[in-house]
């Protein structure tokens, strides 16, 4: 607001022109705005990392909302009775190119792959006759966990949890793939996606490569990522000769979250894993799959 001239005697104080003061204040506010927005939006996100849900209707609403926002991967277990309530959201996710792994629990023994309720809802569908928790993870970042009683009964004191935390979601995915998925029975597997295609979700890459291999059409891949031994950037180009996975039968992975490619390159075979890979040669960030025309 003022300019202080303390290098002269006596010290003088001069008021700055109002237009100049306003311009400086406006400039300072504009400079502060991004930092303030980030700070307070971060606090808001942290406050919303966990939400307690007390009603079946809200659980279904949260599932639909998360499915609508899915960009790369969905893992869902839901009862056969509730499946029709989220069928459209699941089908939309599949149409967007999202990998959808679905377990239908509390399913009738005569449920088959041609049932209209299952049409277009997932890349892989498994069923389990027993009741199990409703569990959803989306993009390994957010999801919902609900006990069976909350969806079965209108009056119960059981509660569900919705979460948005990148540290927790991979643990839930690991539990889904390690506990629920193996216990269920494979019912339907979608056809391979058209090529060429690019995936940032590595499990989707592995699924598509597996389906191509089993159809006698081994694909060619270009992998962008890093070498796991020295963290240096890596680019791997070659033909997929093997996959290790637990999504479709017969499975051949050694532990539940192991999903990898074995790529034959000009310099020999290279193993490729997804985010957090440590037993493979390369951790992939992006994979392009193409027909092998050689």
Regions found by a protein language model. Give the residues of each.
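Acidic, polar-rich N-terminal leader regions of halophilic archaeal proteins
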Residues: 1-294
């Amino acid at each position: 607001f003022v300019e202080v001239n303390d290098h002269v005697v006596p010290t003088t104080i001069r008021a700055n022109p109002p237009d100049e003061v306003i311009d400086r204040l406006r400039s300072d506010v504009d400079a502060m705005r991004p930092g303030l927005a980030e700070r307070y939006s971060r606090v808001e996100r942290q406050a919303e990392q966990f939400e307690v849900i007390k009603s079946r209707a809200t659980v279904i609403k949260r599932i639909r909302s998360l499915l609508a926002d899915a960009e790369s991967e969905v893992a869902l277990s839901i009862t056969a009775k509730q499946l029709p309530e989220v069928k459209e959201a699941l089908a939309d996710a599949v149409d967007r190119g999202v990998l959808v792994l679905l377990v239908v629990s509390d399913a009738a023994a005569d449920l088959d792959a041609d049932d209209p309720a299952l049409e277009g809802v997932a890349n892989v569908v498994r069923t389990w006759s027993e009741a199990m928790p409703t569990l959803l993870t989306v993009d390994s970042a957010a999801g919902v966990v609900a006990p069976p009683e909350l969806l079965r009964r209108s009056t119960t004191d059981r509660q569900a949890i919705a979460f948005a935390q990148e540290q927790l979601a991979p643990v839930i995915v690991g539990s889904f793939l390690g506990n629920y998925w193996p216990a269920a029975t494979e019912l339907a597997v979608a056809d391979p996606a058209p090529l060429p295609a690019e995936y940032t979700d590595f499990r989707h890459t592995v699924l598509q490569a597996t389906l191509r291999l089993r159809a006698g059409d081994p694909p060619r891949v270009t992998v962008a990522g890093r070498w796991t031994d020295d963290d240096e950037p890596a680019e791997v180009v070659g033909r997929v000769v093997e996959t290790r996975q637990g999504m479709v039968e017969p499975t051949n992975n050694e532990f539940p979250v192991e999903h990898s490619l074995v790529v034959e390159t000009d310099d020999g075979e290279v193993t490729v894993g997804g985010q957090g890979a440590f037993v493979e040669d390369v951790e992939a960030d992006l994979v392009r799959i193409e027909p092998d025309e050689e």
